[in-house]
Structures are given as structure tokens and as C-alpha cells.
Amino acid sequence: DIVITQDELSNPVTSGESVSISCRSSKSLLYKDGKTYLNWFLQRPGQSPQLLISLMSTRASGVSDRFSGSGSRTDFTLEISRVKAEDVGVYYCQQLVEYPLTFGAGTKLELK
């Protein structure tokens, strides 16, 4: 199985700051069609996970442009600019390049 690793944030974030959340895969997620099969989700407290970004960098419908995804093959970053209270929750990355589809353990974002 592909192992997805996410790091914890070292400190709570101040509202208005930017933050980067990292994700690493044990195998390249660049498929033969040229697309990178990595999703980002946000699970807000008490809610179901919401898809933020698919194919590494494509924002889902209705998702703020404060969220951006980037990366290459095995190393990925979710950048959140001008953090707001509504961004608090657990961020998960997911690989879709092979079954079983696997998630990282999540990165919790908290505000100061």
C-alpha cells in the first residue's frame, strides 16, 4: 500500500497569517496520463470532510482562492493564505493512484 505521511504544525496559527501543510507519499502520484492524483480535504469540527483540492492543484467548486495546492510526484503542499477562523480543523491528503486509496493521518490547524 502507498503510505501517506503528514507532519503536525509546530504552533497554532495567528489569524491573517499564511500556513503551509505538507504531505509525502511513499510512491510517485504522477500517473501515466500526466495527472497527479492527490486530493486535499478539510474536516471542520463536527462536520464531514470537505474536498478542497483535487489532482494536486485544482480547487473544488466554491473553495476560496486562499487555498492552493502544489507539489511534484511524492512531495506536496497545501498553502492557506490569510487564515480565518473558518479554516480551523484537520487537513487530510489522499492518494488515488492505486488501490487501496490511502489517507494521511491528518494535520490539525488551530488558531492562537
Curated annotation (Swiss-Prot):
- What ranges does the record give for the region Complementarity-determining-3, renumbered to this chain? 94-102
Paired cysteines (S-S): C23-C93
Q: Where is this region: Complementarity-determining-1?
A: 24-39
The record's keywords, sorted A to Z, are:
Adaptive immunity, Disulfide bond, Immunity, Immunoglobulin
Q: Where is this region: Complementarity-determining-2?
A: 55-61
Q: Please indicate if the UniProt record lists ATP-binding as a keyword.
A: no
Cite the residue spans of the region called Framework-3: 62-93
Q: Which GO terms describe its cellular component?
A: immunoglobulin complex
Kindly state a single biological-process term from the GO annotations of this entry: adaptive immune response
Q: Where is this region: Framework-2?
A: 40-54
- Using the record for this protein, list the coiled-coil segments as residue ranges, or answer none: none
Region listing for Framework-1, in residue ranges = 1-23
Q: Where is this region: Framework-4?
A: 103-112
Question: Which PANTHER family does the record match to this protein?
Answer: IMMUNOGLOBULIN LIGHT CHAIN (PTHR23267)
Any further remarks? Answer: This chain was isolated from a myeloma protein that binds phosphorylcholine. The sequence of the V region of the heavy chain has also been determined.
Q: What is this protein called?
A: Ig kappa chain V-II region MOPC 167
